[in-house]
């Protein structure tokens, strides 16, 4: 009984911290506040369309960036509360169009030829890893995505 109450209370605290603080920090309705930013999980788009959507909807902001462990945990909790198991885009992408993989092979030689089946220059979060590690995904596929913006 005591453990059940403790778990229920813990889930309530997480839910309130993700959903209730948005209004307190001048986030738009439904957006969640964390460390000076507002975050929202949207329905599926390709990586490029998701980034354009975030820029348009979020006054020039972008897909969510994850610069430290605390934010990674916040984003993972936000995605977990807002979805069934799935993949979600974040704002990470390989910008060098010529380079699919690492710039060097394990023997130290430079990558001058690639034979990769799919374009995996975009990154997202995977439910299989608890949404806490980044996975390379095909940019042209549509997944849910997390936008970030500054409070109003």
Curated annotation (Swiss-Prot):
Q: Which Pfam families does this chain map to?
A: Lectin_C
GO MF term set? toxin activity
The leader peptide range reads 1-23
ATP-binding as a keyword? no
Q: What function does this protein fulfil?
A: Inhibits human breast cancer cells (MDA-MB231) migration and proliferation, as well as their adhesion to fibrinogen and fibronectin. This inhibition may be due to the binding to receptors of the integrin family, probably alpha-v/beta-3 (ITGAV/ITGB3) (40% inhibition of cell adhesion) and alpha-5/beta-1 (ITGA5/ITGB1) (by comparison with lebectin).
The record's keywords, sorted A to Z, are:
Cell adhesion impairing toxin, Disulfide bond, Secreted, Signal, Toxin
List the protein's name: Snaclec lebecin subunit alpha
Protein species of origin: Macrovipera lebetinus
Disulfide links within the chain: 27-38, 54-147, 122-139
The keyword Signal is assigned to this record: yes
Tell me the superkingdom of the source.
Answer: Eukaryota
Ranges for domain C-type lectin: 34-148
Q: Summarize subunit and interaction data from the UniProt record for this chain.
A: Heterodimer with the beta subunit (AC W5XCJ6); disulfide-linked.
Which Gene Ontology cellular component annotation is one that this UniProt entry carries?
A: extracellular region
């Amino acid at each position: 009984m005591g453990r059940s109450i403790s778990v229920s209370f813990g889930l309530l605290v997480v839910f309130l911290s993700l959903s209730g603080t948005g209004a307190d920090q001048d986030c738009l309705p439904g957006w969640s506040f964390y460390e000076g930013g507002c975050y929202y999980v949207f329905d599926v788009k390709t990586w490029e369309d998701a980034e354009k959507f975030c820029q348009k909807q979020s006054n020039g902001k972008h897909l969510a960036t994850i610069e430290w462990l605390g934010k990674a945990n916040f984003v993972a909790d936000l995605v977990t509360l807002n979805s069934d198991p799935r993949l979600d885009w974040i704002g990470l992408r390989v910008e060098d169009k010529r380079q699919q993989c690492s710039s060097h092979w394990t023997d130290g030689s430079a990558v001058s030829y690639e034979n990769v089946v799919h374009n995996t220059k975009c990154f997202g979060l995977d439910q299989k890893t608890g949404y806490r590690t980044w996975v390379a995904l095909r940019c042209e596929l549509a997944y849910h995505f997390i936008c970030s913006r500054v409070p109003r």
